[in-house]
Amino acid sequence: MSLPPAFADWFARQGWTPHPHQLALLEATGDSLLIAPTGGGKTLAGFLPSLVELAGGWRGLHTLYVSPLKALTADIGRNLARPVADLNLPIRVEDRTGDTKASARQRQRTDPPQILLTTPESLALMLSYLEAPKIFGSLRRVVLDELHALAESKRGDQLMLGLARLRSLSPGLIATGLSATVEDPQALAGFMGGAQVVHADPGPDPDIAMLPTSRPPPWAGAGGRYAVSDVLKAVAEARTTIIFINTRAQAELFFQALWAENDQNLPIGLHHGSLAREARARVEAAMAAGELRAVVATGSLDLGIDWGDVDLVIQVGAPKNVKRLVQRIGRANHRYNAPSRARMVPANRFEVIECIAALEAVRERDLDGDARGPGPLDVLCQHILLTACAGPFDADALYAEVRSAGPYRDLSRADFDDCLNFAATGGYALRAYDRWQRLMQRGNLWGLRDPRAARDLRMNVGTIVEAEMTKVRWKRGGGLLGEVEESFAASLVPGDSFLTGGKIVRYEALRELVVEVSPSPRKEPKIAVFTGVRMPMSAELSHRVLSLIGDPSRWEVLPRPTRDWLSLQAQVSAVPRPGTLLAETFPHMGRWHIAVYGFAGHNAMQTLGLLLTRAMEESGLGPLGFSSTDYALLIWSLDPVRDLAPLLDRDKLRAGLGDWLAGNAVMKRTFKNVAIISGLIQRNMPGGRRSGKQATFSTDILYDTLRRHDPDHLLLRITAAEAGRGLVDFGRIEEMLDRSPVLDHRQLDRVSPLAAPLMLEMGRVRIEGQGRMRLAEQEAEALMQAAGLQFTDDPAGFDTPAEPPHRSRRAR
C-alpha cells in the first residue's frame, strides 16, 4: 500500500522517504509487532495508519497509545502536533496520566479525543469506570510503545489484561506493538496474544569498545571512579554524552567525582528516579535544548525521549544484561542507518572479562532474556476487583476474556476461581472480616458489595511497588531535593551527611515524614543514601563469561593483565570452566575460606551463601560470614571444610531453602508486595498514604496469621513462587548445578589469584572517605602479593583490540 497523496507530499516536504516497515504497518489488517532499532521511526510507523484513517474524520476515541513513561507520552504528543497541524487533520490529541488535571480527566470520560496517550496504570483506571464501554466502544487502534520493556514486569501483564478488556468492548480493534530488538520476537508476539512480526533493517553495527584509561581498574569495587578523568576527556571530545551507571548510589558518587575534576566547567546533569520530579524535568529540558554536555543517569533514561544531539554513550560498570546494553547504546545517534558510538568502563578486574563478553554478544547480535512465566495471579486479583468497579460481570465471560490475554492463555479455571474467591472474601482465613468482603454474587453476576469501595480500589491501582520513600527538602520550607528510603531516613542522626541530587547535605531533622537538610561543609559524605537491590548478571551473559574464562584459546581477546591473571590462576589452582563447578578452600590470616565460582548472578550466589553457612553452622564448622558477587561466593569460618560435596547436594539445599524461607524477612517482604498488588492491603487511603512502617506492620501480621491458619492461601502460594524467582533466585542455583555436574574441589595452602579480589569485598561499605580508600589500597596491595599477583599493570593493556578476532554470528 502506498501513502495517500497528502501524506506522500508531507513526507517529501520533510525530506523523508517512508521506510519499508512503516509501509508494512500501513498495509497490515491485523495485529502487528514491529521490531526496530532506536531511531528507526517506530513511533511514526505505529501512528501512520491512525493518521491516515483519521484524515476523513472520526467521532470519539480512535487510537489509544500506551507508554511506560509519562514523559514519553508528553513527548509523543508534541511530535504528533506537527503532522496534525501540517496536514490540517480534524483531530484532538491529548494525554491521560497521573499528571493530567482532574478537570481534563473528567471531560475525557464524556468527550474523549480521537487520539489518547496514556500509561498502563491510567488505562486500568479508565477501564474501571462505568463509562468505559462508551469511551472505548469506538476504539479502532491500540499502539503499545516500548513493549519489550513493559513485558519484563507486571505492568506488562496488567496491560495485556487491559488489552483483552478493550477487545471485548471494541471487537475488531487492531493492536500494534513497538519494540527494540529482542532475543525472541515470536515470544513477544505471543505475549500480545498473537501478532504478525515485522522486522525493520537493524542498521549498522555499533561502534563499541572499552574506554582507554590512564589507570587500570581496581581489583574490587563498583564505582568506576578510577576512570573519572578519562570519562571527562571523552565528554569534552563529544557533542553530548549519556553516562549510564547501574545504581542510584553509584550515580550520585560518580556525578560528585566528575564535578570535583571538571576543571573545564562542562555543564553536566544528574538523572535518576529518586530525584525530585522538577529536578528530572529540568535535566530533560536542558538535554532537549542542547544545554548539557553530559548527563549521569541510571535506568531512568534507558527508555524515553529521543535526543538527537547525543553522540556518545558511556557505560560505567559492567552492564549485567546484553539487551539492556544494546538499548543504552541505541540512545546515541538517533539517526537511522548511522552507527551508535559507545564506550565501556569496567569497575573492577572481574568486570573487565564481563565487559569483553558483553562486547562479543553485541557484535554477534546475541541478546539475552529470561523466558516469561505465566501471568501473575496477584495482578489478576487486582484486575478482577477493578472489573467489578466498572459494573457487574459474569465469571465465565471474564474467565474467557482473561484467557485471551497472552500471559494468561494457559490459566486454569481452578486458579481463576481462587483469584475470584480471594477478591470476594479474602480467602478462607479472612472471610469473617468485613473489610475483605468486597464482592457478592447476585444471580450469575458478581459485583461490588459496597459501591463506595470503588474509590479505595482505584486509589491503589498499579503493579509498581517501590521501596517506601521519604521526601528530602531544604530546611525551613525550602525546595524539594528528592527522596530517600524510609529505612535510611530512620537511621539518620543530626549532623550526618549524605549525597542526594549531586549535593552533599547535612541532616537536620525529620518533620512530618519529610527529611530536612542544610548544605554540608564536608567534602566526603559520611554514609550511603540508597540500599536498593543490585541487578544480577543475566544467565546468558554469565554463561558467556564462564565460557571465555574456561577456554584459554580465546584469551587473546582479553587485555594482557587479565590474561596474566588467569594464567597464574591456572598454575596455582584451576580456572572455572563449563561442566565443572570450581571450589577452593584455603587458610588466610587465621581463618578458613571457601570460594565457589558459580557464575549464577548475585541473588543466587547470595542465597547459596545463606544456605551453605546455615548447613555449616548445623555441622559445627563455625561459619563467620560470607560475601557474594555475580561470579562467586566467599565464605570464611573457624574450621576447614574437607568435603564440600554434601553441602552442595541439591536435595539438601532445597530442604534448607524451605526451612530458611519459612520465617525469613525475604518472604515477608515478597508477601508485602503481593498483598499490595492483589488488593489485600491499601497503601493509599482517603486523606493520606500509609507509611512503609505501617504497611509492613500490617502485612507481617497477615503473613503470620495466614501461615498459621490458612497455609494454602492463594497469596502464600504466590509469595513462595515469586521469592524463588526473585530475590532468592533458587532456580539459578539449580541451573548452576545442572550445567556443572562435576565438583572440582581444590584444597590450597594460600589464597588463589581469583579469590583475592573476593577477599576485598569482605566488609566493604558503599561510601568511603579518603582515609579508608588509602587503607583499602594498602590492604589490596598486601593481599595481591599474598596471592602472587605482583606483576606490573599497564593501563594501556586494558584497551580492547581495534579489530577483535572475527567470530561468526550465531543463527537465531
Segments from the language model and where they lie:
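Short beta-strand-centered aromatic/proline hotspots
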Residues: 503-510
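Helicase motor core with emphasis on the C-terminal RecA-like subdomain
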Residues: 1-12, 17-27, 31-40, 45-444
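Extended, highly charged accessory segments
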Residues: 399-402, 406-469, 483, 528, ...
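A conserved acidic, glycine/proline-rich C-terminal tail/linker
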Residues: 478-497
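Short acidic-glycine loop/turn motifs at beta-strand connectors
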Residues: 441-444, 475-477, 510-513, 639-640
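Short, acidic/hydrophobic/Gly-rich beta-strand patch recurrent on exposed beta strands
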Residues: 471-475, 518
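Short, solvent-exposed secondary-structure boundary/capping segments
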Residues: 511-528
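Short, well-ordered loop/turn sites that connect or cap secondary structure elements
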Residues: 18, 464-466, 492, 499
